[in-house]
Amino acid sequence: EYLMDKIRIRKLISSLAKRDYRRMYMNDFFLTWEKTDDEIAATFLVAEILRGLREANISCRMFDSGLGISLFRDNSTRTRFSFASACNLLGLEVQDLDEGKSQIAHGETVRETANMISFMADVIGIRDDMYIGKGNAYMHTVSEAVQEGYRDGVLEQRPTLVNLQCDIDHTTQYMADMLHIINHVGGVEQLKGKKIAMSWAYSPSYGNPLS
């Protein structure tokens, strides 16, 4: 069984080589519809490869040090722990940015904060989903700030930003749900011609995020 796992992993890696995902390097992952079919497929393949490696008890550690910064402007359980687990799997330590305990409360700008937290950061995950027109725009502001810091030599590397839910997309949730469905039906080809029903539950005691 272990040998079969290794064979399957190698096949997935070979499949990954056939996809064009060059634009994803040194780039952010904000909205699902901004990515090409190849980039979405490559993301699914990498997820499956990592899953296979973990099931085969093969280390996925890519980093000896570094930070994964999380900023949650709304409550989270599944996404918070998923992000922390992913960072840990790859060898990054997670540091949660509490804006109330930072210099942001004293007037520090987004540009200043973004660069300050990015000195040893490889990835920044942000959830900002409460207000229409705000969340995704804020993520782009942070992205532009770290890009400027990297360009000007303030940062030796540019951290990648990941949308952990904004006002218009819940990227990581959509991707995880889609991959689960693909695996459940036995492959993406099996989805052709299928109908998927989506239900919406509303409770006055729970504020549903906009996206």
What do these predicted ranges mean?
Residues 2-81, 85:
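Positively charged, low-complexity intrinsically disordered leader regions
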Residues 67-120:
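Active-site cofactor/substrate anionic-group-binding motifs, chiefly glycine-
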Residues 73-88, 178, 182-211:
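Glycine-rich phosphate/diphosphate-binding loop of Rossmann-like nucleotide-binding domains
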Residues 94-96, 124, 161:
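Hydrophobic beta-strand scaffold residues
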Residues 119-131:
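A glycine-rich helix N-cap at a beta->alpha junction
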Residues 132-143:
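Active-site-adjacent beta->alpha loops and helix N-cap segments on the catalytic face
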Residues 138, 161-181:
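A glycine-rich, Thr/Ser-enriched phosphate-binding loop motif common to dinucleotide/cofactor-binding enzymes
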